[in-house]
Amino acid sequence: MGDTLEYTEEEAQQEESTFKTPAAIARRQLVREKLDFQPDDDVLSIGCGPGFEPAEIAEDICQNGHIHAIDQSEAMLTLAERRCSSTSNITLSRADAVALPFADESFDAAVAVQVYEYIEDLDTALAELARVLRPGGRAVVYDTDFDSLVWHATDQERMRAICEAFNDHCPRPHLGSQLAPHLRDVGLTVEQVEPNSILNTRLDEDTFVYHLMEAIKTYVVSRGKITANVATAWVNDLRETDADRETFFNLTQYLYVVQKPTE
C-alpha cells in the first residue's frame, strides 16, 4: 500500500479483516441499495479487494447478469478468488482503473469504493469509468476525506503526528469532499452525494477502528515514518483510553451516485 493499490499478503489479510466489520458490511449494503441492481445488469466492480463486493452483488442479480471484478493487487485477487470461485457469473481479473480492459459502453452499473483516492491520474481513471458505462448507466463512487477524522487520544499531539504520517498512504487523502467537479468534467451527472460516517466507541476486534489502528501502525513503522516505540505507545494509549470507556472515533466518507447521460 502507499502510492499504489498493490498490497503485500499481510496487508491484504489485514484489509480483509476490516471488510468483515459491521461498518464495512453496512457500507456495502448502502452501496447496493443506492444502485438498485436489476436482474440482468452487467456490473463492473473496480477495486474489488478481497471479493466481498462482487460476491454480494451476485446475490442481487440473476444468471442473466454478470459481474466483472478487477483489482490491481495479486494478493487481493487471491483472496477474492477464494470467496467468489463458486459463483459462475463473476469474472475476476487483474487490471488498472486508468486503462480498463473493456469495450466502450459495456456496463449497466459500476462500483468504485475507496479506489480513486489511491490513483494519481484521477481524471483518466474517471474518464475510463464514463467510457465503459452504457448511456443511462449508473455508478457509485465512494471515497474518504481524512480531514473529517475525529479520534480521541490522551496524547493528541502524538495522534496528529501519526495521522499526518499515514496521510501519504494514498495520493488523494481528501478526495471524498472534492470529487464532484472531477466527475462532471468527464461527462457524468452527479445525482446524489451522501455522507456515511463510521462511528466506533469501543476498540473491540470487530470494529473498524481496531483494524485501522493496526493498519496505521504497520504502515507508519514499515515506511520509517514513525518509530516502533512511538507507534506502540500510541496503540497502548488507545487501549488504555478504551479500558476507561472513552474511545471515540468518527470518520466521514462520501458516496456519489452518478449517471451517464443518455444523449
Where are these regions (language model features)?
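Class I SAM-dependent methyltransferase SAM/SAH-binding core
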Residues: L44-I46, P50-A99
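A short glycine-rich, Lys/Arg-flanked "PGG" loop and its adjoining helix->strand segment in the class I
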Residues: D123-R138
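A short acidic, Gly/Pro-enriched loop at the edge of an enzyme's catalytic core
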Residues: V98-A109
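Core SAM-dependent methyltransferase catalytic element
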Residues: V186-L188, Q253-E263
